[in-house]
Structures are given as C-alpha cells and as structure tokens.
C-alpha cells in the first residue's frame, strides 16, 4: 500500500524546465554565446553551485555568472507573468486521488526555497503540499 508520494516539482508538476530552457537561451545571447541542447541537459536539475561551475567551464572563467543568473531569472519571471506557469497534465487529478485515498504527498526541488514557493504560486499550487524538500 502506498503511504506517501514525493513529487519532483520541475518537469513533473510544472513545466518549468521548458521555461528555464527558453530563458537561458535568451539570456545567453546577451553575452554573445549560444547554449546547446547538450548543455541544457547536463545542467538540468543540478544544484546552483554546480550550475555556476558548469557555466564557467562552458563559457570561460571570466563569464559573469551572477549577472547571467539575474538576467535569466528576470526573463523567467517576465515570461511567467505574461504567460503563467504551465501545470503538467493530470497533476490536479492525481492530487485529488491522493487526498480521497488519504495518501500524504510532498514536493521536492533543487531550486532554492524562495524560488520554489514563487513557482508553485505561479502555477496555483502554493499551499497544496504539506512539505517541501
């Protein structure tokens, strides 16, 4: 019997990975670079510090990582405000099923907590989960 479910937020609950990819591609052009699909796959879901190291390895040690991250976040939020954050198909139905069957559920993410809360809010999922890890 299933006692609990742990959802990965990015790519399972919300379609944030597609939004991140678009924003990253747009932001990197400001620095005269392009981002390959291979790079995007390599950095998907990794912790922030590992992401920063990957940027330096890919684009050089003088690459302005923090400025790029600020540009990237700005583009992500601009797109979310304009278009919303898509929720993956079936999420609401699955949550309803879990509630009806008294199965506890939580959300996991490699995002920092503040960003995760904002993304869940943008997807109308804030407050739905008892725990976040």
Model-assigned labels for residue ranges:
Residues 84-86, 106, 112-133:
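Substrate-recognition "cap/lid" segment bordering the active-site pocket of phosphatases
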């Amino acid at each position: 019997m299933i006692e609990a479910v742990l959802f990965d937020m990015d790519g399972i609950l919300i379609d944030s990975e597609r939004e991140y990819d678009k924003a990253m591609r747009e932001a990197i052009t400001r620095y005269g670079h392009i981002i390959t699909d291979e790079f995007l796959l390599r950095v998907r879901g990794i912790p922030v510090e590992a992401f920063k190291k990957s940027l330096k390895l890919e684009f050089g040690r003088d690459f302005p990582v923090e400025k790029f991250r600020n540009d990237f976040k700005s583009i992500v939020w601009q797109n979310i405000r304009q278009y919303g954050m898509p929720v993956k198909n079936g999420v609401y139905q699955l949550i309803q099923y879990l509630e009806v069957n008294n199965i506890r559920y939580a959300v996991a993410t490699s995002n920092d907590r503040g960003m995760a809360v904002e993304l869940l809010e943008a997807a109308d999922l804030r407050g739905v989960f008892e725990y976040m890890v």
